[in-house]
Amino acid sequence: MHKPNITMACVVHCKGKFLFVEEMEYGKRTLNQPAGHLEKDETVLAGAARELLEETGIRAEMQKLVKIYQWHAPQSQTDYIRFLFAVEL
C-alpha cells in the first residue's frame, strides 16, 4: 500500500507582505512557506499552527483552506499530500 507523507503549509499575509522562511534544500538556500509534517494523533489544523509557531514564533489559527494537492519530490522520490492554509495577521 502506498502511503504519501502528509504535510501542512501556511501562506501568511500581513500589511501587504507575505512571510517566508529561509531553508537549505539540497545544498541551496531557498525561500519557503512555514511548513512541516503531520505528527501522530495531530489534526492538520493543529499541525499547521504548530509548524507556524515552531518556524516563526507566530501563534495564529488557520483561517482558510486554500488548497490540497499531491506532489512528488524527484530528488528523494517521496510523495506528499499537502494542506495549504491562509493566515492574515
Per-segment meaning from a language model:
Residues C14-E54:
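Conserved Nudix-box catalytic region and its N-terminal flanking loop in Nudix hydrolases
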Residues W71-L89:
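Active-site-adjacent beta-strand/loop module that shapes the phosphate/pyrophosphate-binding cleft
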Residues M8, Q33, K40, W71-A73:
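Generic structural "secondary-structure junction" signal
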Residues R59-K67:
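A short coil-to-beta-strand element that immediately follows conserved catalytic motifs
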